[in-house]
């Protein structure tokens, strides 16, 4: 699947490959000692955010695209 920004598509594929490799070769085998794809994700995230702004796509709460951020607690 392509990214929201054409310029971001290669970054998305690179991140997807990195994540899938890490998930299959490390995480599923019990090694959760780190995510080697963090820098790729951050670059891809910035590219997508820029594309969304350039295309003037109205998205409330763009901060949901954070990596490793805690989810806000629900007030039930």
Curated annotation (Swiss-Prot):
Key word Glycosyltransferase present: no
Motif (Cx9C motif 2) on chain: 37-47
Site (described: Important for interaction with PRELID3A): 27, 41
Subcellular location: Mitochondrion; Mitochondrion intermembrane space
Induction: In p53/TP53-dependent manner in response to low levels of DNA damage. Not induced when DNA damage is severe.
A Pfam short name: UPF0203
Record-annotated disulphide pairs: 8-47, 18-37
Residue span, CHCH domain: 5-55
GO cellular component: mitochondrial intermembrane space; mitochondrion; nucleoplasm; nucleus; protein-containing complex
Short motif Cx9C motif 1, span: 8-18
Entry annotated with the keyword Ion transport: no
Catalytic reaction annotation: a 1,2-diacyl-sn-glycero-3-phosphate(in) = a 1,2-diacyl-sn-glycero-3-phosphate(out)
Residue numbers carrying N-acetylmethionine: 1
GO biological process: apoptotic process; cellular response to UV; DNA damage response, signal transduction by p53 class mediator; intermembrane lipid transfer; mitotic G1 DNA damage checkpoint signaling; negative regulation of apoptotic process; negative regulation of intrinsic apoptotic signaling pathway in response to DNA damage by p53 class mediator; negative regulation of release of cytochrome c from mitochondria
Coiled coil start-end: 1-52
Keyword annotations from UniProtKB, A to Z: Acetylation, Apoptosis, Coiled coil, Disulfide bond, Lipid transport, Mitochondrion, Transport
Gene Ontology terms, MF aspect: p53 binding
Oligomeric form and interacting partners: Monomer. Interacts with APAF1 and HSP70. Forms a complex with PRELID1 in the mitochondrion intermembrane space. Interacts with PRELID3A.
Function statement: Involved in the modulation of the mitochondrial apoptotic pathway by ensuring the accumulation of cardiolipin (CL) in mitochondrial membranes. In vitro, the TRIAP1:PRELID1 complex mediates the transfer of phosphatidic acid (PA) between liposomes and probably functions as a PA transporter across the mitochondrion intermembrane space to provide PA for CL synthesis in the inner membrane.
Recorded family membership: Belongs to the TRIAP1/MDM35 family.
Protein name per its UniProtKB record: TP53-regulated inhibitor of apoptosis 1
Source organism of the structure: Homo sapiens
Source species taxonomy: Eukaryota, Metazoa, Chordata, Craniata, Vertebrata
């Amino acid at each position: 699947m392509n990214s929201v920004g054409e310029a971001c598509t290669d970054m998305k594929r690179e991140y997807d490959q990195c994540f899938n490799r890490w998930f299959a070769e490390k995480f599923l085998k019990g090694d959760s000692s780190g995510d080697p794809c963090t820098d790729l994700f951050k670059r891809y995230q910035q590219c997508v955010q820029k594309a969304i702004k350039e295309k003037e796509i109205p998205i409330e709460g763009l901060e949901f695209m954070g990596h490793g951020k805690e989810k806000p607690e629900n007030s039930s």
